[in-house]
Amino acid sequence: MTRSTDTLRGLATRAIHDGQHPDPTTGAVVPPIYQTSTFVQDGVNQFREGGHEYSRGSNPTRNGFEEQLASLEHGTRAFAFSSGMAAEDALLRAVLQPGDHVVLAADVYGGTFRLVDRVLSGWGISHSIVPSASADDAARTVRPGSTAVLWLETPSNPLLRVADIAAWARVADDAGALLVVDNTFATPALQNPLTLGAHAVAHSTTKYIGGHSDVLGGAVVVRDAHWRGETLAERLAFQQFACGAVAGPFDAFLAARGLKTLPLRMERHCSNALEVAHFLRSREDVVEVHYPGLEDHPQHDLAAQTLHGGFGGIISFRPAGGVRAAHEFVAASELYNLSVSLGGVESLACVPHTMTHASRVGTAYEVPEDLVRLSVGLESIDDHLADLDRALGAASRVGRRDVPSVGGARQQAA
């Protein structure tokens, strides 16, 4: 759905109003959920207002959410899918063909790596991994004539590396390739990759956009760009309709409702996370903290330039006691529920090595076994700090007790 052309209004105003117009028939302030599979025609191929025929092709609830998200990302069109991985799969299949080469930043989400490494490789798509977030390293990884996509996640999952999107975009342009940025962690409340030169943005709307851990979804937002004789929007629209992994009306409604409060929620996620990061940094029983809001983060200055309004709600750290201490910490915490996924109002913790990045185990890009990822929620900051203090205290005494398992390689989610 094409977004509003009014880009002068503030982020919070657009989040609430773009694509979310009162119902013209009843005057309902909140647009209704069009929970329907098909639409009545007044005659053969004579469609009513909106041109809706079948909900796989278009649905007013989904289209409204797509317009809303496109506005926040400063894109020309957005496309909503049934999951973040469905969105990534649709985007890559829309632009790639056998013989193409994909460049992946080292710290991309494990599911993205698995999709490219184990699924697309069977269709003649090769890939290389950049050993860092550096655009110079990305340029050296490009294969002239065959590299079609550069895929970047910034801040990255789970090590919170920050990349220079504009520099990566120049590398992509020089290679005649597309730059895709996974903006799930930053969200359009903090970062707009399309304005920095990216061609497309991918989201797991399950995370901060939905924001309440009650919906599964994904989205792709594109700017006005052409690829192999068609616009990116045309390619994505065909892929969405032809393959059908669309967001259902109720899921689109939940995502749209979450998006309305995204700017406000991200303020609290960011402020809580910054305090938690400083708290962890001050502890002798924590040996490493990854958060771009910390001044000693290697890309702090870059993060301050590219992220506006905060540094995000995700932190990762390594306790002094190693993997057993990491397992004890997540078992002992009462506020941070042990779970995959992130971005909800409630706080979550996980051990990425076996819970979210198991596809990396045994590779050069395996994440540390003792790394703990925190999705810092909206609870009172005093409760965060008290709970972390208790859980870290338990982790420091890990040698006195058995440590429960937190999962195995079978798990692989956000």
Q: For each predicted feature, which ranges?
A:
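Conserved PLP-enzyme active-site core in the AAT-like
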Residues: T2-T7, P24, A78-D285, H290, ...
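C-terminal core of ALDH-fold dehydrogenases
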Residues: A15-V29, R324-V361
